[in-house]
Amino acid sequence: MSGLLVNKTAIVTGGSRGIGFSIAKLFAEQGANVQIWGINGEAGQAAAQTLSEQTGRQVSFALVDVSKNDMVSAQVQNFLAEYNTIDVIVNNAGITRDALLMRMSEEEWSSVINTNLGSIYNVCSAVIRPMIKARSGAIINISSIVGLRGSPGQTNYAAAKAGIIGFSKALSKEVGSKNIRVNCIAPGFIDTDMTKSLNDNLKNEWLKGVPLGRVGMPEEIAKAALFLASDGSSYITGQVLSVDGGMA
């Protein structure tokens, strides 16, 4: 079999839909053994079955709440028991709880920080030792243009996504000597369930700020992730790849 990720193993968090689903699909098409993680068992199993059918490869699903350190650690050990190594991890899971700061509850703040940023710590701290042992690995953390520019009503989301960038740059310096690369992707206005829920007026306002004049597709984020996961980016670490139609 030919492909950029043949015989590689990969975990994609939040892989049941949207960007994560597209990344998992492309990775599998390129020869990787892929496992998607999510918190909805029914949706996750269905997504894994669909991915397996579409790619002709066995894609598995694990029920994991990435905001729970013990669940993450346990599933990493399960994955290693089955596949022996973790070559690529894509931290894509995330939520939004939008509100102006003056109206934002502590719970709305904490839930977004814990899920979007705390999960990065949980997953990376669990996979880093086996990657160091293997002296190889690619960590891809999905940030956002909001983490670069900010967005009104999203102080929690912006803080988490900006934190992911800082985390990734710091970690890249810790583990670079072990041949482990850590990079971020900062998607812009992408066609996902999250953006589909926006009203037309808000969508049009967003599009005014996109020089390419259109919404991005999840598959375009997946192509960026494939590049960062493959040997084509073997001398790239600690970077933020903006895939945003020129918004940043």
From Swiss-Prot:
Family: Belongs to the short-chain dehydrogenases/reductases (SDR) family.
Top EC group: oxidoreductase
Active-site residue list: 157
Listed GO biological process terms: fatty acid elongation
Name of the protein in its database record: 3-oxoacyl-[acyl-carrier-protein] reductase FabG
Binding site for substrate: 144
Pfam family, one: adh_short_C2
Gene name, Swiss-Prot/TrEMBL: fabG
Reaction catalysis annotation: a (3R)-hydroxyacyl-[ACP] + NADP(+) = a 3-oxoacyl-[ACP] + NADPH + H(+)
PROSITE patterns on file: ADH_SHORT (PS00061)
GO molecular function, one term: NAD binding
Pathway(s) where this gene product acts: Lipid metabolism; fatty acid biosynthesis
Function: Catalyzes the NADPH-dependent reduction of beta-ketoacyl-ACP substrates to beta-hydroxyacyl-ACP products, the first reductive step in the elongation cycle of fatty acid biosynthesis.
Domain of life, source organism: Bacteria
Species this chain originates from: Chlamydia trachomatis serovar D (strain ATCC VR-885 / DSM 19411 / UW-3/Cx)
EC number(s) recorded for this UniProt protein: 1.1.1.100
Assigned keywords, A-Z: Fatty acid biosynthesis, Fatty acid metabolism, Lipid biosynthesis, Lipid metabolism, NADP, Oxidoreductase
Subunit field text: Homotetramer.
Lineage: Bacteria, Pseudomonadati, Chlamydiota, Chlamydiia, Chlamydiales
SUPFAM superfamilies in the cross-refs: NAD(P)-binding Rossmann-fold domains (SSF51735)
CDD domains linked to this entry: BKR_SDR_c (cd05333)
Residues involved in NADP(+) binding: 14-17, 65-66, 92, 157-161, 190
